[in-house]
Amino acid sequence: LPESWQVHYKDLTFQVKPMNFKHTGLFPEQAVNWDFAMDKIRHAGRPVRVLNLFAYTGGATVACARAGASVCHVDAAKGMVAWGKENARLSGLGEAPIRWIVDDCAKFVEREIRRGKTYDAIIMDPPSYGRGPGGEVWKLEDNLYPFVELCSRVLSDKPLFVVLNSYTTGLAPSVLGYILQLLVGRKFGGTVTWDELGL
């Protein structure tokens, strides 16, 4: 098995390499979300600013940038952000309008709110459990609701979409849908849908 290799999806290219915990740096089941985001961005009829939180190696970041969006990619792991930059470069998007941020996602969103920054779309893929760069503890069951509420405050007046992914076995997709409906749907309108992804 090679140390790393490239995978192509449509006009996107990703570097894949086996890591601990059976990760490869790519979640191919997310392609349905990449397609959704690219379609929304391409048909928005306006410039789109996307905030990608817990952005990992940047699959969604690269897809949104390919569709023409300005993207802010945030992950607490420096190595994942570097990998995301490499995926953008491999996809011919090395000079695309992407901000690469190594930070705790909640703290970053709080600062963006104070700065008056807004985004037309948010993609988030929070872990079940994790630690931020400053040792901050994240537990999805405890932190998701207040985190989505916080994120709703950085959305523009006419948001295009919000995508929330979770691999936490204890939370049904309907629970995530309910949280989005309560905190985003009621505030901005639109349609909230949920489903399970698989290969």
What annotation goes with each model-predicted range?
Residues 158-199:
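C-terminal catalytic and target-recognition region of SAM-dependent MTase-like enzymes
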Residues 57-71:
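Conserved SAM-binding loop of SAM-dependent methyltransferases across substrates and taxa
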Residues 28-46:
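Conserved alpha-helix/loop element of class I SAM-dependent methyltransferases that forms part
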Residues 78-80, 102-105, 119-150:
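Mobile active-site "lid"/loop adjacent to the S-adenosyl-L-methionine
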Residues 52-53, 73, 101:
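Conserved SAM-binding loop
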Residues 1-28, 35:
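Non-catalytic substrate-recognition/targeting regions of SAM-dependent transferases
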Residues 45-56:
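Conserved class I S-adenosyl-L-methionine
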Residues 77-123:
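S-adenosyl-L-methionine
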